[in-house]
Amino acid sequence: MKKRTLLLTLAAFWTATTISANEPTLPFTAAVKENGMWGAVNGAGQVVIPISYDRLGLSLSEADEQKEDLLSEEGRDDLIEAEKGGLRGFFTRTGKEVIPISYESRSIWKEGALAVRGKDKKISFYKKDGSLISRAAYDQVSDFENGMAIVKQGATYGYLSLDGKEVKPVYQEARFFEDGLAAVKEKGRWGVIDMTGRYIVSPIYKDTGAAFQEGRLAVKNQKNLWGYIDREGKEIIPPAYKAVSPAFSEGYAAILGDSKLWGFIDTEGNVTAKPQFKAVLTPFSEGLSGVKTIDGNGYARPDGTIAFMADYDQLFPFKDGLAEVREGEVETRAVRSLPPISIGIGWGWGDWLAFRHHPWGWGWGIGLPIWYPGRYDDEPVTSVTEKRGYIDKTGKVIASPANDRVFSAGRKGILLSKDGRYGWVDREGTYIAHTIYTGLLPDEEDGVLLAKDENKKWGLLSMEDGHELLPFSYKEIRSLGSGLFGYKEEGKWGIADKEGTRLTAPLYLAVSKAGEGLLPVKTKNGWRFLTPAGHEAFPHDDTFSDVTPFSSGLAGVKVKGKWGLIDQTGRYVMRPAYEDLDIL
């Protein structure tokens, strides 16, 4: 099978992605290789990107960065990156040049814009339509957020809008825009500007929060007291507190009283919970905030009453009815590390709440990781050996951190392991599969669990109630997509559906991922395609030594060492002619 097949590991946690029926269909494009160089063809087999590049793909970022890159924004997969002579550029799927082959490194696409760094080490921005946002070159930039990017020239910061308008870099520090306003520092004091650079709030404060949230911005006056202003600069909540949370969440913020205890206020400054907590550990989420009391950690309501105690080292906000919790040990060791890159200052709960190893934070440092100065430092770093768990809004344990490992919660449940065995619980905490399996691969899209028992045999379980769909008698089982599964018996592969029905006997040398309802299988006479019912989709006179899954009605096939394209009837759209092929 074509080399882009992913290999599954026993402990892997798979989250299936679904393409919405409302999403526009992208033009078919395949990368092709000829005489050692890459280009691209369309669905008719016509060359749309010249075959003259060293590399070509949807993303040429490092492998561990490609997922974030390709999911950075809607429409990202309509762009193809090419490289020649160490420089890169972008094309559309139809072959239109978006960014010329000119940059050495880049950011990810955000809000239809991309930051690129050229050979001169200066940074500029392009739009997806290929236009240059500004001809000014910057030393450091952020991604665009809410229509504005922070830019640095020399030692000062400014802003650039998507339409190329610049707020001149005159500020000592700058923070992101939110609702058309941003906090900036000039002459040692903080104020608030609009998107034209006009001051809405004069620079009179010693510090501010990261950005407006729910119409409020935290500010610190010359007496080192904190309060909040509204969008007009009015001190709705006059500075009177030693510390406050950086932003409101669900209409509430945390405040530190004279007693060195924390309480809650609403957006008008009314105290809803008098100072009583040793720390506030999370912003409000789904009506609850993680807090530290004299009796331990728990979750509190806006009025300060404790919903339930949660005796864990770390608490996290709720999401879809579940909150992550963690327990862990702390140790300090020396490591060699790169210094962080940030424009302005970081801002997070840890500055106030003295919960030093809490990973939850409202981070506002900015800058592209590609702009590292290349300097290493030896420094002591605190390492936390953590174990994750999940609880619901009553405090019920859904997945205990006492397990050796609890994986990130999925839409239907949670994978966990203990003593070298794997299990699965649903989001109510019911064990669907107890921790008795030596391997477990959740397939949430098809609602099944691929499980391996202590005899090294694989079976298929229902994700709904754990009942056995396929018996534990197979050397291997693979999820093939489209509700189909491959099972291996006596060295050959057969096909089954998600109900456990065997659609074919074990006849095939290999199987691969289904594409558009057609399943590639390998016989002694090469690769063929099956229908969902397990029948041959079409006969073909040629022997396919390799194939790709179908995409947009076409599949790649390799015949006598060359790649071509066929449609779903087996007809050649592009006869085999290329050294390599990759459907994008």
Regions found by a protein language model. Give the residues of each.
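Sec/Tat signal peptide C-region and signal peptidase I cleavage site
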Residues: 17-21
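Positively charged n-region of N-terminal signal peptides that target proteins for export
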Residues: 1-5
